[in-house]
């Protein structure tokens, strides 16, 4: 149980480096990445909403992936940028818990949206004649609501485990945001239940969502090979290839981060990996899923042409 004598009211985030010249360089780099991520994902959401021919299940799910990536990056990057410039690198205890909650919730929302997108591709490629009726607006709304609700509840459960820990001593977190592994290393109460819960929840959700994706593709690949037209096969492989690329990158980093017990070495390595999936992946998803998509590019060109014409 959480002790009443908890003394820590704020934590110090050590960030990525203490070298001033590197901090300025990294600030510039991550600010540029964040601006591209925000502008790109917001633009993608608006583009899909504004163009009627993009009102299909695939783009509906893509718009939600863009929204989650935007939230994912915004939960971490602004504080990281502040740490690069500020002498006081602190975060309050409540703010730390909120950041932990949002991170855990958004990770689970994203992995299940990726699973839903795999199922959507299965329906489109393996059952094209029934796709329109079975992937109705109500079905799509249900499929996208489940990840949000489940992610919110899972994040709350895991954050409550952290809240029940007592932090009475050191308050320096060896990270650039409030991540569970380095945070629980600072607890002065028993962390066994929290570590066990973290391992089980991460292991189960990563494995189960990946299982859904793998099963979907076990049906998708044979169906693609049966497509007679070369253009049809190339289009199907291109769509699935983009999805598999994003899945591989995202899941590999998460498995590396969470399926190991916290230690000094794992925290240091995890910090480097976390840079990639909290700042770079939200930008990469935009490129992988959107800018390689013919319909999205055509819609973007049309919107830009109209703005130039009316300006």
From Swiss-Prot:
Q: What are the annotated glycosylation sites?
A: 4
Give any Gene Ontology cellular component: plasma membrane
Family affiliation: Belongs to the G-protein coupled receptor 1 family.
User: Does the record carry Lipid biosynthesis as a key word?
Assistant: no
Cytoplasmic-facing ranges: 46-53, 120-138, 217-236, 292-311
- GO BP: G protein-coupled receptor signaling pathway; sensory perception of smell
Q: Where in the cell is it found?
A: Cell membrane
Q: Which InterPro entries match?
A: GPCR_Rhodpsn, GPCR_Rhodpsn_7TM, Olfact_rcpt
Note the SS bond partners: 96-188
Give the superkingdom in one word: Eukaryota
Q: Which gene name belongs to this protein?
A: OR5M8
Please identify the protein, giving its name as recorded: Olfactory receptor 5M8
| One of the record's GO molecular function terms | olfactory receptor activity
| Principal location listed in the UniProt entry | membrane
Segments on the Extracellular face: 1-24, 75-98, 160-195, 258-270
Chain segments annotated as transmembrane: 25-45, 54-74, 99-119, 139-159, 196-216, 237-257, 271-291
The alphabetized UniProt keywords are:
Cell membrane, Disulfide bond, G-protein coupled receptor, Glycoprotein, Membrane, Olfaction, Receptor, Sensory transduction, Transducer, Transmembrane, Transmembrane helix
Has keyword Transferase? no
In what way does this protein cross or attach to the membrane? Multi-pass membrane protein
Biological function: Odorant receptor.
